[in-house]
């Protein structure tokens, strides 16, 4: 659809122009800082930052109904810059010119309704939001599109020259960072730090394929994170972990899309989000809050964070009901199938604490919850979900297991509708599925496959076939016909087929 075909009252708003001012605000001391510095923590108190906007064109002039109309019409516009997360440009980064936006096809991932079998199992309607269908096969692309668009903008404005983008990763962040940095070409190089032996082969192959320098170190993600934080503090590098506030902005698009897909009616919705470094749940809360304050939605959905008992610092923090008695303590992680969430000291924890308070205050009631699930529950849930037509990764299984726990705890009611964040594609974690089917988990995982969920190929062997067939010389004539009939007959028995 072309601009001149749009209603006159929104035509000038469809393709936005850069406007307003953006600034960092410290979560701790609330000081503000200019965005044309690569800041990740407050220079004064050391706390993490969040990004804010002011004086954005049309922002205060337009009501919620008009914003909804603008975003719905932008769906029909064939313009690269606002096809992805920047459909919601004014709510993400309204200072970046459209020609500086990096778009690789991220965002607007499908909401897939659970089938009748799954609905019956849990007792309510729910959906999987398949963020594994992003370009690098995970939700990280939302934040990376924003962070690299910002770098692209600042590099051109400030003439910064060559830049090294760096991150620590459990696998998905490194794949996304390397992909988006590669798109920007020679002026941005990427390096990623991974915990040796704790990233799936599929995830490891991605940054290597994108040309990143991949550095593996002994330990876990939290150790890698400390190293990249040290590098960011002492060297000229761009940190691309969720400590980078631009990542949070891009990931807010997850909330905006859910609101739009439900026609902005989210009153009885419950969003299930796995928690690792806590950037994603930060973004989900922040996104819904922005839409609520701007009048695009009239209610705030419930937010349920989910953690494995093998990496559960946020769950432990909120186990204490008295806010005055809560004390955050990092935990030592144990092996987890939800590798992307295997983090014991999430850098966005201060953001979570701040936004949970804001969210519940705006909702007028407690609307944020955290549940804990076992490794067994995660794997069983992933296998069951995918046996019913989904592509859930282990973190998607974590969300599904969390839905059941939240229902048991009374956080989610029968008339609620669940939305489960499946953060990555199942193919990234196919090794865990194979371990489940073969019952080959290390005891530390504490996963014992259910017999009814295991599945392995049935190999058919025929001596006659091996005797008469060789490469390039398959059996022919009656020999071949006999073999086909013999094999077909055995398969029919295995599959319990009935004769015509």
Language-model segments: what does each one mean?
Residues 108, 203-205, 215, 219-239, ...:
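Active-site/ligand-binding loops adjacent to catalytic centers
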Residues 141-147, 166-184, 200-202, 277-284, ...:
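Short glycine/serine/threonine-rich phosphate/pyrophosphate-binding segments
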Residues 149-157, 175-187, 289, 401-411:
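Alpha-helix C-terminal capping segments
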Residues 12-103:
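N-terminal juxtadomain amphipathic helix
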Residues 81-157:
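Positively charged, low-complexity intrinsically disordered leader regions
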Residues 375-432:
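Claisen-condensing/thiolase-fold acyl-transfer catalytic domains that form or cleave C-C bonds
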Residues 157-180, 187-195, 267-280, 303, ...:
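A short, small-residue-rich loop immediately preceding and capping a beta-strand
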Residues 230-295, 379-383:
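Active-site/ligand-binding-proximal alpha/beta "capping" segment
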């Amino acid at each position: 659809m072309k601009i001149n075909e749009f209603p006159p009252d929104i035509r000038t708003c469809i393709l936005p122009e850069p406007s307003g001012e953006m600034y960092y605000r410290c979560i701790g001391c609330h000081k503000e800082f200019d965005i044309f510095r690569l800041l990740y923590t407050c220079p004064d108190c050391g706390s993490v930052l969040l990004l804010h906007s002011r004086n954005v064109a049309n922002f205060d002039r337009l009501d919620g109904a008009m914003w909804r109309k603008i975003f719905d019409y932008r769906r029909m516009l064939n313009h690269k810059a606002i096809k992805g997360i920047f459909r919601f440009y004014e709510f993400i980064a309204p200072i970046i010119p459209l020609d500086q936006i990096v778009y690789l096809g991220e965002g607007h991932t499908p909401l897939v309704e659970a089938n009748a079998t799954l609905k019956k199992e849990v007792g309510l309607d729910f959906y999987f939001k398949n963020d594994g269908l992003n370009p690098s096969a995970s939700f990280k692309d939302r934040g990376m599109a924003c962070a690299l668009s910002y770098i692209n903008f600042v590099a051109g404005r400030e003439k910064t020259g060559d830049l090294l983008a760096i991150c620590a990763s459990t696998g998905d962040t490194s794949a996304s960072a390397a992909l988006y940095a590669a798109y920007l070409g020679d002026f941005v190089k990427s390096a990623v730090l991974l915990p040796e032996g704790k990233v799936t082969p599929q995830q490891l192959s991605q940054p290597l394929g994108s040309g990143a320098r991949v550095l593996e170190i002994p330990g876990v993600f939290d150790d890698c994170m400390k190293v990249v934080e040290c590098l960011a503090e002492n060297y000229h590098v761009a940190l691309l972990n969720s400590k980078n506030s631009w990542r949070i902005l891009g990931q807010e698009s997850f909330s905006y899309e859910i609101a739009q897909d439900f026609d902005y009616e989210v009153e009885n919705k419950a969003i299930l989000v796995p928690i690792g470094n806590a950037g994603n749940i930060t973004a989900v809360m922040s996104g819904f809050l922005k839409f609520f304050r701007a009048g695009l939605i009239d209610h705030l959905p419930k937010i349920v964070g989910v953690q494995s008992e093998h990496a559960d610092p946020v769950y432990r923090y909120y186990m204490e009901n008295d806010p005055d008695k809560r004390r955050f303590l990092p935990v030592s992680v144990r092996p987890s199938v939800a590798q992307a969430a295997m983090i014991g000291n999430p850098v966005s924890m201060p953001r979570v604490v701040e936004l949970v308070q804001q969210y519940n205050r705006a909702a007028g009631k407690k609307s944020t919850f955290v549940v804990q699930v076992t490794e067994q529950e995660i794997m069983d849930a992933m296998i069951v979900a995918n046996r019913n037509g989904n592509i859930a990764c282990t973190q998607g299984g974590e969300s599904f297991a969390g839905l059941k726990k939240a229902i048991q705890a009374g956080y989610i009611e029968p008339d609620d509708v669940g939305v489960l964040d499946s953060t990555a594609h199942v193919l990234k974690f196919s090794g865990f599925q194979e371990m489940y089917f073969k019952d080959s988990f290390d005891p530390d995982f504490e996963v014992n496959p259910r017999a009814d969920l295991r599945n392995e190929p049935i190999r058919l062997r025929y001596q006659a076939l091996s005797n008469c067939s060789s490469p390039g010389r398959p059996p022919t004539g009656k020999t071949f016909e006999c073999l086909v009939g013999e094999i077909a007959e055995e398969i029919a028995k295995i599959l319990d087929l009935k004769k015509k």
